[in-house]
């Protein structure tokens, strides 16, 4: 063992052993408790960023810890490899997206290996390979057979920049989630999977996920959005036409309805538009709008049709408006609006000066004064004719009863969740395994043709969607010519089932091996960002239920425990150019100025520019505040990064990147290395720990050792407070640095303490721990197969030795160390032979002995 810590030599050495021995390969073992640890796999964009490093370090720490607990751990890695970035890069660089993707995978895989991550690389998955997506195509056909898939022309979110459809979950503030460009509405044919069939189950089963973050469950609950209400038939004024299925969410407020809103695609909207040019123009303009009825803060606009419907009870005329915020394909594409008691409706009514009528009293019985805020309390009904003075629930019941008795209304439950649009109009994705016959009928492609493989010989100078690629167009089905579907799958479909394929990635007889999948599933620990709460994390719960209903998996949910790690932040800086436009600038390009408290100044001058400090914000390429993991590894080593990431903040919180903190961690590792080196050089393994010979200091350290093992175990297992666990290990390690190694029992205590410290640090800093363990362990074992240390209850719950105060005639004269609960005779045997006590006794007879065990012995002479 070398005297100084040198990660540049240690880490490659340890990694080479792991590779040679295939240390982390795992197979099914019914004699061991299984543990499946999985982090969301990356898109092979080119390089890992610090967010990746944090995510995968967390999962690796958990996986290594669970192995030390004796569990059979599956910890796989793969690549979510289809998608627009590869296609756009291919266009830009005149290359094939496959080539770009596989080159990135090769580079990023080496980066992951350099981080010391304990993956079973034999289970690696790449989702753009036919051997993966062929089973996705098979799966889609099975869903089609079960009537869970359909194609229809519908309004979709369209990204003009990327020329493709976006799911509702992929539109954020009317912008594309990926490219941040404006999203418009467009009507095209799309394939859908009926996720709405599972809406109730997806919602209810959130209650069966006690180890998921409440925030994620709340986000999913709101996204699925279960609502109750009634649908009503209304007569149009001066016409015999019936307006069907007009929705109101709170029946008790029906008497306060003052107008009706329709979606632009409502049948009546089109009928009116045929006669009125301005309305036709308005409907066309709405196609570029992505507002929804749930977007309270968005700009909602409407147009008066000058048509009226009759209130179902009062028969008063209600004006009909067409608006941009009623969803086109929603169950509620016509709404009976009650502005006094609904904020959406109130905002619209105020904007267009529509009537506002309150019909529910405040809880104190007073009439509400409606200005800018709707009244939503559940008081008594008033201003409601025959329903006056009924309480809220009774009023709702009576109104529903009257509507149903008159056959003009019925109770319904609907969901905000929409069916999943899985068609994408791009090349780099899995082809949808459907075709169109000459009679326009959609048919699944026969299984013998699967997989439908992307044409790879096309020139990529002018890459186009599959609809423009003649190599994929024609196929014969039952001797009939069929035109292949030109759309590809939404890449969220690939990422919705890799967790299951990891359990059996070399299984060739089907999508999933039931035997292997049901040994490993559900995933015990899943790690990923909370930004996936209403996209990936809903989709893969849904797909798991589909797999269950196909008989491929047994559990109802794919994951037991979810951890959403926080973002990684770093300092960002900007200046204003001559056009007064904000320009972000890298910290490497400026000289940062600090104030008297060593904090970065809010603004300062560098290179003749006034530089502003934006504070700690999320690392990103656009802000030039990213930190390259490779640079930090070269400077400090992988283990330093790993330990800093796990120590600097709770895993679910944002982590502020500070190189001063990295330096502090590196300094700690160097000190611990030197301490271990000095001990190993002196220690003779024949020296045994003899607790009965401990001094008070040794006893204290021994007790602290076992307290540390206990509390670190609790922090990791119970609350995943890894940062607190590390701080406890560091605190105890610093205690060890004060021990003199000249005393044999000190050496024995140091040996036992260092063994435990290195074991506890192993999940965090595996290279460092591996290298020291080779020399520290008496049997020269491999730490990769060592168990987590166990603590001694006796050492924690009670002291092994106590200080006994010796008094003579009530005055303190001496103190000794004695084992707990030592007898009076034993204490006397010790002290009566000591010269100090003999001097005070001066040969006088002892008249009385007062002994309080573990505290005081008083001799009365």
From Swiss-Prot:
Pfam families: Anticodon_1, tRNA-synt_1, tRNA-synt_1_2, tRNA-synt_1g. The keyword rRNA processing does not apply. GO terms for biological process: leucyl-tRNA aminoacylation. One of its GO terms (molecular function) is leucine-tRNA ligase activity. A motif ('KMSKS' region) lies at residues 618-622. GO terms for cellular component: cytosol. It catalyses: tRNA(Leu) + L-leucine + ATP = L-leucyl-tRNA(Leu) + AMP + diphosphate. Its EC number is 6.1.1.4. Keywords: Aminoacyl-tRNA synthetase, ATP-binding, Cytoplasm, Ligase, Nucleotide-binding, Protein biosynthesis. It is found in: Cytoplasm. The keyword Nucleotide-binding applies. Its main location: cytoplasm. ATP binds at residue 621. A motif ('HIGH' region) lies at residues 42-52. NCBIfam families: leuS_bact. Belongs to the class-I aminoacyl-tRNA synthetase family. HAMAP family: Leu_tRNA_synth_B. This is Leucine--tRNA ligase. The gene is leuS.
């Amino acid at each position: 063992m070398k005297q100084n810590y040198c990660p540049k030599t240690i880490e490659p050495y340890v990694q080479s052993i792991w590779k040679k021995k295939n240390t982390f390969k795992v197979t099914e073992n019914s004699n061991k408790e299984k543990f499946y640890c999985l982090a969301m796999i990356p898109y092979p964009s080119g390089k890992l960023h610090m967010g990746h490093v944090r995510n995968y370090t967390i999962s690796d720490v958990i996986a290594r810890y669970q192995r030390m607990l004796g569990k059979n751990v599956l910890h796989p890695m793969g690549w979510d490899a289809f998608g627009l970035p590869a296609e756009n890069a291919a266009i830009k660089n005149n290359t094939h997206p496959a080539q770009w993707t596989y080159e990135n995978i090769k580079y990023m895989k080496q980066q992951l290996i350099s981080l010391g991550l304990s993956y079973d690389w034999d289970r690696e998955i790449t989702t753009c390979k036919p051997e993966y997506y062929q089973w996705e195509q098979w799966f889609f056909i099975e869903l089609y057979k079960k009537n869970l898939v359909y194609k229809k022309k519908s309004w979709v979110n369209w990204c003009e920049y990327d020329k493709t459809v976006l799911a509702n979950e992929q539109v954020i503030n009317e912008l594309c989630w990926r490219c941040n460009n404006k999203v418009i509405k467009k009507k095209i044919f799309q394939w859908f999977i009926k996720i709405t069939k599972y809406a109730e189950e997806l919602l209810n089963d959130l209650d069966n996920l006690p180890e998921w973050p409440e925030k994620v469950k709340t986000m999913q609950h709101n996204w699925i959005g279960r609502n109750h209400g009634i649908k009503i038939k209304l007569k149009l004024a001066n016409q015999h036409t019936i307006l069907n299925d007009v929705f109101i969410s709170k029946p008790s407020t029906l008497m306060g309805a003052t107008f009706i809103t329709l979606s632009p695609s409502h049948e009546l909207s089109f009928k009116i538009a045929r006669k009125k040019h301005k309305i036709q123009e308005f409907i066309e303009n709405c196609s570029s709008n992505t507002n929804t009825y749930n977007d309270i803060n968005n700009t909602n606009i409407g147009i008066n049709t000058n048509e009226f419907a009759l209130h179902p009870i009062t028969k008063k005329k209600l004006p009909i408006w067409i608006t941009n915020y009623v969803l086109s394909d929603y169950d509620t594409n016509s709404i009976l609006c009650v502005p006094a008691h609904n904020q959406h409706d109130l905002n619209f009514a105020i904007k267009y000066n529509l009537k506002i009528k309150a019909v529910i009293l405040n809880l104190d019985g007073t009439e509400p004064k409606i200005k800018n805020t709707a009244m939503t309390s559940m008081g008594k009904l008033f201003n409601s004719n025959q329903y006056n003075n009924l309480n809220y629930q009774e009023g709702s019941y009576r109104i529903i009863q009257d509507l149903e008795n008159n056959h003009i209304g019925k109770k319904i439950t609907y969901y905000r969740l929409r069916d999943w649009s899985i068609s994408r109009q791009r090349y780099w994705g899995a082809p949808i395994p459907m075709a169109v016959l000459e009679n326009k009928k959609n048919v699944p492609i026969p299984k013998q043709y699967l997989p439908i493989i992307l044409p790879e010989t096309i020139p990529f100078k002018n890459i186009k969607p599959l609809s423009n690629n003649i190599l994929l167009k024609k196929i014969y089905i039952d001797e009939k010519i069929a035109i292949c579907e030109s759309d590809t799958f939404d890449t969220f479909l690939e990422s919705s089932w890799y967790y299951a394929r990891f359990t059996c990635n070399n299984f060739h007889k089907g999508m999933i091996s039931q035997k292997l999948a049901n040994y490993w599933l559900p995933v015990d620990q899943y790690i990923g960002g909370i930004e996936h709460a209403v996209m990936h994390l809903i989709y893969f719960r849904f797909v798991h239920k589909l797999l269950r209903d196909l008989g491929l998996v047994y559990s109802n949910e794919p994951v037991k425990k979810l951890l959403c790690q926080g973002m990684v932040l770093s300092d960002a800086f900007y200046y204003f150019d001559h056009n007064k436009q904000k320009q972000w600038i890298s910290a490497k390009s400026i000289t940062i100025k600090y104030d008297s408290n060593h904090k970065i100044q809010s603004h300062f001058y560098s290179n003749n520019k006034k530089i502003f400090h934006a504070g700690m914000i999320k690392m990103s390429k656009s802000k030039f505040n990213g930190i390259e993991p490779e640079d930090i590894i070269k400077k400090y080593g992988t283990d330093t990064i790993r330990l800093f990431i796990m120590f600097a903040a709770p895993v679910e919180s944002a982590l502020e990147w500070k190189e001063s903190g990295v330096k502090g961690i590196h300094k700690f590792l160097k000190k611990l290395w030197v301490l271990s080196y000095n001990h190993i050089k002196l220690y003779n393994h024949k020296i045994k720990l003899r607790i009965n010979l401990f001094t008070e200091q040794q006893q204290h350290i021994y007790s602290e050792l076992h307290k540390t093992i206990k509390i670190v175990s609790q922090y990791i297992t119970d609350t995943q407070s890894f940062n607190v666990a590390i701080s406890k290990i560091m605190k105890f390690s610093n205690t060890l640095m004060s021990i003199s190694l000249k005393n044999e029992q000190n050496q024995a205590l140091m040996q036992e303490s260092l063994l435990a410290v290195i074991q506890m640090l192993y999940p965090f800093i595996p290279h460092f721990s591996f290298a020291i363990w080779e020399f520290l362990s008496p049997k020269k074992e491999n730490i990769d197969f060592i168990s987590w240390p166990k603590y001694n209850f006796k050492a924690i719950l009670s002291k092994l030795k106590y200080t006994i105060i010796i008094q003579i005639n009530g005055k303190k004269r001496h103190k000794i160390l004695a084992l707990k609960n030592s007898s009076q005779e034993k204490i006397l045997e010790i002290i009566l032979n000591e010269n100090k006590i003999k001097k005070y006794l001066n040969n006088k007879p002892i008249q009385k002995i007062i002994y309080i065990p573990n505290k005081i012995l008083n001799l009365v002479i």
